[in-house]
From Swiss-Prot:
It is found in: Secreted. Its EC number is 3.1.1.-. One of its GO terms (cellular component) is extracellular region. GO terms for molecular function: hydrolase activity, acting on ester bonds. The active site is at S37, D329, H332. It comes from Arabidopsis thaliana (Mouse-ear cress). The keyword Mitochondrion does not apply. Keywords: Glycoprotein, Hydrolase, Lipid degradation, Lipid metabolism, Secreted, Signal. Residues 1-24 form the signal peptide. GO terms for biological process: lipid catabolic process. This is GDSL esterase/lipase At4g16230. The lineage of its organism: Eukaryota, Viridiplantae, Streptophyta, Embryophyta, Tracheophyta.
Amino acid sequence: MSLLVFLCQIIVLSVLFFSEVCLAGKKIPANFVFGDSLVDAGNNNYLATLSKANYVPNGIDFGSPTGRFTNGRTIVDIVYQALGSDELTPPYLAPTTSGSLILNGVNYASGGSGILNSTGKLFGERINVDAQLDNFATTRQDIISWIGESEAAKLFRSAIFSVTTGSNDLINNYFTPVISTLQRKVVAPEVFVDTMISKFRLQLTRLYQLGARKIVVINIGPIGCIPFERESDPAAGNNCLAEPNEVAQMYNLKLKTLVEELNKNLQGSRFVYGDVFRIVDDIIQNYSSYGFESEKIPCCSLVGKVGGLIPCGPPSKVCMDRSKYVFWDPYHPTEAANIIIARRLLSGDTSDIYPINIRQLANLKINA
């Protein structure tokens, strides 16, 4: 036996041993994250895009800007830590996201992305859901190379997959100011929503075919209440915009039906529907009871009448106490709001997350 062959065998055995130890000692499931800027952990840092958050004051309570579109942690960060993780799920495009690190999960989310490939064009580069699934397929092969088909299948069966998408398909596609005026005249909301659902059905089915079994699907929040939408229509006054919320709820109703359909048709799957619209709407309507002082004005914004239209950046002013604001910037919640949302998704009843919550999902044994 040559020295080279011997060394190669040692390396292979070491990798297999390490992988088995890593899996055997795993107390929490791997975490695979798909979605948009609500859960992006820094993938857009590596893209030529206007949708970036890797500059101050973003991440002010994180220690430094990471590419997260908030002052601190995202919902998936909080959920994964609550399940017992000491680490946060790394972004797919980061050069360090490789080797045994991927056995704990990967974040594929991209700011500005959506279900439809036409969504987010105005930002430049973004990784829409189809491309995120392509990236997961690559990770899947890497994991199989590390630990083999059988162990990889076990890992994927126990892993938590979350998909947080759809908001940009409305905000930055169907309801894009000025640009989408003609589209809304010729495409009825019902038709657009049906297009989203049809595409999403294919995407979630593909995720299942790639090995995912425990899948959390987050609906669209009350986008008519975000500072950007309020500021874009002065006639709304202090009210949320009705039409974006109505279309979001039209989509959400069909999404819940889709989740029930997939649970019925895809053997061994457990899809869970997270009603973030209901949770965030409750926070906004009852903000003071949650300890917030502002549910309309973003913590990070430019001074002036249109401050709620401009993304958070170096020229922005930051509120003194981030824990008192529901919104960090014109689009995204603060960490304080994210904590409330995450807790209700983790442990809420069926009015918040259906048919089971994330803690129950994590403990669920799936053999198929």
